[in-house]
């Protein structure tokens, strides 16, 4: 999951810091033997045997000294030819997040059952075979970033050379290369699957790998943020006077209003409605905001009425906000009078409001619903099913380790704000067979879908290469897989995309 929506903090940082048992630390012998177990799963009416491996891969520096370990779980189909069998590497974002969310919620062989747009009931939690797994299409490797999961920075290593956008890419590249070597997967079709900050990681990573002789067949970008300069926050470079953030946020805000039936005479189709709002946002709204203080009063009033109609926010609030309502303010204001605050990761989720006077949310509703279920279920799964034995605690994030080194260095190639669109452009140009799938949730205020399609539509690719980007839009939020209906649609779209990509010659 997880990308920051609150200025001056990293996603989940506050939650992680509140749990002292999750503190970054070292153990005398953090590297333990892999666990290897056998399982089976029924997909599309067919039973498949598969092998699950949980373990660590140690990274080394230029002097061949071990610096850190990265934890992973890999699921490989029994009896398949590894020379032709695809392999997909999954990772979450943060930066700092472990890959618990994708591992336990998306396309692996098991899935945690959580509340869909509702609070998950308390323990015991339910873990089921995942009928939406992609294991019949690809082998699956879920990778936790350095110093998260069961991975640790090893004694004597310089953490500042491990954290940061460029260092992080080098770590993932080395992990992938060592995995390919260890399991002789060099001939396998290779895919990258990143969520949230995992999407700029993917853009940098695919470019880096290909420029170092490791070809990639396809990249899945779920809930993208390739250009921080277009983000709906001023934390990493988008100035608060930059109107793009309000334009990109509007269709997402409208989707949440549609979901809660706050839109009079709205179309029954969510897709039709948000595309109607998109046309307004990129047209009349964009043009009027560009006029700034020169916008005529009559036109100002017209936009006030339109924003009220699309979002359900009061005209008084819209006037006071000077027509500009970013995602955080919308989430706090939308049902303020009911004492409710919407979730940034998924606007369908809500919590009772802590402070009705606060301009932005104090708590994240999506986290409140799912975090305990995911953490408990994964720990049980590792112990009872994968039989992975270690003295270490599983770290849901590397945030404390990062904080001990200062801050995450977002500079990429010496530049800020972080903008990895050029990396993806270069990767798609260098490898004209590369295919990209962009997955987006309509209710995601963290990485608004309109910002994503704007970014991907401005890579300045030649048209034949631009056509290699496919899109999926789903009735869900940042973590598309939280909605089983959206997960089923996402699975089917990806299955078709994989098959199409694997037929590229």
Per-range role (PLM):
Residues 291-446:
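Alpha/beta-hydrolase fold catalytic core
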Residues 109-113, 207-312:
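A catalytic-pocket lid/entrance helix-loop region that shapes and gates access to the active site
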Residues 184-196:
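Alpha/beta-hydrolase fold nucleophile elbow
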Residues 134-138, 145, 162-180:
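Alpha/beta-hydrolase active-site loop
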Residues 1-22:
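Gram-negative bacterial Sec-dependent N-terminal signal peptides
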Residues 475-486:
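Catalytic histidine-centered segment of alpha/beta-hydrolase-like enzymes
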Residues 193-207:
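Glycine-rich nucleophile elbow surrounding the catalytic serine of serine-hydrolase chemistry
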Residues 24, 64-161, 457:
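N-terminal cap/lid subdomain of alpha/beta-hydrolase-fold enzymes
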